[in-house]
UniProtKB/Swiss-Prot annotation:
It comes from Sporosarcina pasteurii. Required for maturation of urease via the functional incorporation of the urease nickel metallocenter. UreD, UreF and UreG form a complex that acts as a GTP-hydrolysis-dependent molecular chaperone, activating the urease apoprotein by helping to assemble the nickel containing metallocenter of UreC. The UreE protein probably delivers the nickel. It comes from the Bacteria. This is Urease accessory protein UreF. Keywords: Chaperone, Cytoplasm, Nickel insertion. One of its GO terms (molecular function) is nickel cation binding. HAMAP family: UreF. Belongs to the UreF family. It is found in: Cytoplasm.
Amino acid sequence: METYIQESDISNEDDLKAFCDMYLRQNLASTDAIIAQEAYRLAKENDLQGLIRLENICHAIKLSPETRKGSMMMGRQFLQTVQPLNNSELFTIWCEKLKNKEIKSHYPVVYGIYTAMLGVDLRTSLETFLYSSITSLVQNGVRAIPLGQNSGVQTIFSLLPVIQETTSRVMTLDLEHLDNNSIGLEIASMKHEFLHSRLFIS
């Protein structure tokens, strides 16, 4: 997103809303949300090997090095935050595998595992995953454009129906529907690495 802001493609609240709407429907719905959903299901089945395979798929579908690095960093930070809150055997094993550098711990995989072990239903898991992804994006947009906090709140509020709609759509999909078709985002992410100045990683 920061690339688009510096290239003046995102310069106001309406642009930010349109970008986040597109990001939900065209990017998250066909990539990370499907990964998070599949991680949730595999965790419910206690399928460790399936989760490792899923994480390899997640790693492969992220074409930009910055996107890959950002997903792993977020996953590790999230894992570090929630690890003391969950003592399930699967979650403990996952933490050990990360410690031993056997896995990369991408964010959507960790999120799916954690919410499954937490006992929330799948819809809540997906809605909160999408909500947290979009609120982070909006907060970054508010800082980088820049916009006022009210614009950020209004943007998030306007996207709530899109989050619900996207959740319903993702729940009808599976790994066969995984599709990284957001070429513009991937190119922007690759260009982001070489921006003269930047506030965020991809």
